[in-house]
Amino acid sequence: DEKSHQRLWLNRSFFDERWSRNRCVTSLDWSPQFPELLAASYHHNDDAPNDPDGICLIWNTKFKKTTPEYIFHCQSPVMSTTFARFHPNLILGGTYAGQIVLWDNRVQKRTPIQRTPLSASAHTHPVYCLNVVGTQNAHNLISISTDGKMCSWSLDMLSQPQETLDLQ
């Protein structure tokens, strides 16, 4: 059968010696606005205790660059990442500490411009799933954590969830 002889070929690897060495990838997401951009979140590097625990690298698959397009980091390993649909410059991360962080690629800083509080009203365990749902004019960020909570957030106000559902 001709189909059984089809093979996959490695076209390209995305690796940065400084930022992705000894880190496992925890999440991937393609940009809905810029299909050539791929966000990859990474866990901490045990061999580099002075480096940030959480990293999110934005790779450009269109150009043959050997370095990420953007480098973002935070104080906790990033377990999930997503591009903010309807906001082409915003990238969200769900952390091991239970926080959600927001990066903006227009700002000349690698740390989050906004983050959720460490609070019992929000997540208290790792955030493994993030998704922006809704329409251009009415949308929310949905987050799910191993604490059994699903939270709904406004991207304009990450100080507290708009709604929390206990899934247990």
What are these regions (language model features)?
Residues 61-64, 105-108, 156-158:
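Short loop/turn segments that connect beta-strands within beta-propeller blades
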Residues 34, 52, 74, 87, ...:
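Short loop/turn segments that connect beta-strands within the blades of beta-propeller domains
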Residues 115-153:
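Repeat-solenoid scaffold signature
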Residues 38-39, 91-92, 142:
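Structural core positions within WD40/WD-like beta-propeller blades
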Residues 1-58, 111-117, 148, 152, ...:
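Acidic and/or Ser/Thr-rich intrinsically disordered tails and linkers
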Residues 30-35, 81-89, 130-139:
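Loop/turn segments within WD40 beta-propeller blades
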Residues 17-20, 71-74, 118-122:
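Surface loop/turn motifs at the tips and blade-to-blade linkers of beta-strand repeat domains
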